[in-house]
Amino acid sequence: MNKEKAIVVFSGGQDSTTCLFWAKKKYKEVIAVSFDYNQKHKLELDCAKDICKKYNIEHHILDLNLLNQLAPNSLTRQDITVDKSAPKEGVPNSFVDGRNLLFLSFVAVFAKQKGINTIITGVSQSDFSGYPDCRDVFIKSLNVTLNLAMDYEFEIITPLMWINKAETWKMAYDLGVLDIVKEETLTCYNGIKADGCGECPACKLRKKGYWEFEKYLMN
C-alpha cells in the first residue's frame, strides 16, 4: 500500500478544507477531487479551485451532473428552499441521496488509476446534520465494498468522524490554517462565503462550533 499519497474529497467547505490541510501535513503528495453535480451555488466549486490554486494543490473536478436529475433537493434546485431546522422524521431536504456513495466510489476509481490507496473525506458522525451517509458504519461498509469491487486495497480515512464542530475549528487552529478555513471556505446552504447567511442549519452549526471554540481559547 502506498502510504505517501492521498486523495481528499474536497468541496471547498469548512470540513473538507480542514481535512485537506491535515492531509498536507501527513502525506508527501495530496490531490483534491471536487464534484460538479449541478449544485445550486457554483461558488462552492470556485472556493475549491481558489484554495487549491493559492496553496499549490493538484485539483480535479469530476462531472456528476446526473446526480441532480436523480435526486432533486434543496442544494440542487432553485425552487426548493432549505429547511431551517431538522425535520421530526426522515432526513433534511438538503440531503442528496447517494452523494457520498457516488463521490467516494468515483474517487476510488480515480485513485486506483493513480496508484493511490488512501482516500480522505470530511464526514462526521458526532456533529452531523442527520445525513445517513456521514455515519462511520456506512464508511466502513463502503470501504469493504470498494476493496472487493476493484480488488484493490483502499483505506478511507475520516479525520473528523468523532469530533464536533468546535473541535474541527481547533484542528484548523492547530494546523495553522484557522484564517483560511474561516475566510476562504463556503459551508452555507445559501451560497454565502465565510460566515454565511447565519440562518441555514450549516451556518448555525458552524457558528455554534466557532463560539464554543473561542470559549475554549479563552480558558
UniProtKB/Swiss-Prot annotation:
Function statement: Catalyzes the ATP-dependent conversion of 7-carboxy-7-deazaguanine (CDG) to 7-cyano-7-deazaguanine (preQ(0)).
Stated name of the protein: 7-cyano-7-deazaguanine synthase
Family: Belongs to the QueC family.
Enzyme Commission numbers on file: 6.3.4.20
InterPro entries (alphabetical): QueC, Rossmann-like_a/b/a_fold
Source organism of this protein record: Clostridium botulinum (strain Kyoto / Type A2)
Reaction catalysis annotation: 7-carboxy-7-deazaguanine + NH4(+) + ATP = 7-cyano-7-deazaguanine + ADP + phosphate + H2O + H(+)
Taxonomic classification: Bacteria, Bacillati, Bacillota, Clostridia, Eubacteriales
Enzyme class: ligase
